[in-house]
Amino acid sequence: MVSYSLEKALRFTPLAQVDDNLKGKPGDTITYPKFTYIGDAKDVGEGQAIPLDKLGTKSASAKIKKAAKGTQITDEALLSANGEPLKESTRQLGLAIANKVDDDILEAIKKGTQRVTIEPTVEGIQKALDVFNDETEGTVVAVVSPANAAKIRMDALKNHAGSDTIANAMIRGTYFDVLGAQVVRSKKLGDTEALFVKSDVTSPAVKLIRKRDILVETDRDITKKITIMTADQHYTAYLYDDTKVVVATISESVGEG
């Protein structure tokens, strides 16, 4: 039941590639390679040697951690409650873990090295999209605060740009689409923050490594007549390809106070 609540509450997981390969295996640290591009091919004349480039690699590591939350309910609370405290505890435990996983995914994205300052306008969205240094196709999700989402949408309507009809939205509750970027409102970001993430199955922006699925345990303190319930999950979220991320600082539009 808690795992069901967790999956329903998770919102930003689609921005990450979920990897369950560590489940049931020893170790709490994952080391992964990061390859650098060898460059475009060049014209080679007849009889000339093909230039050989070395594939550049560097490694990074991420450590598995545990997110946990617990509740306790007295027998008096169970007997006198109008609702269903145990069911509500289950729901809230799933929500608590989901919020922590979402927070960690966003924190990983914030480590991106491609940075830009923009205004909350259609032009600002274009400026951020121009930072992506590749020409590969992929859905771009722009995560902004509710206030900035409203400003961008108003500017889009004024300039006859954008659409409220979104096909194949990556994130539940996507607000609207402008210049091909799916704008998502989130109170997890401040009014000076915006995150742009390009989807790529081959080289995702973020990876979410799950060591163990959510585990729920209950116990009784018979001396105090208390029911204890805990939930925890072992995982880590890390920035895998920062070329798929643009971290923007939002400033007020010219003329705004």
Which sequence ranges carry the predicted segments?
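Sequence/fold signature of self-assembling virion shell proteins
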Residues: 1-13, 22-37, 55-64, 155-257
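Extended, solvent-exposed, turn-rich assembly/linker loops in the middle of proteins
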Residues: 108-181
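Generic "edge-of-domain/loop-turn" microfeature
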Residues: 37-39, 69, 78, 149, ...
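Charged, often Cys/His-bearing segments associated with DNA-binding zinc-finger transcription factors
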Residues: 17
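Long, contiguous amphipathic alpha-helices that act as assembly "spine/axial" helices in icosahedral shell
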Residues: 32, 56-114, 133-134, 142, ...
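Active-site-flanking structural segment that lines cofactor/substrate pockets
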Residues: 44-47, 51-59
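Helix N-cap / beta->alpha transition motif
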Residues: 74, 143-148, 197-199, 241
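Short helix/loop capping segments that flank catalytic or ligand/cofactor-binding pockets
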Residues: 40-43, 81-82, 151-154, 238-240
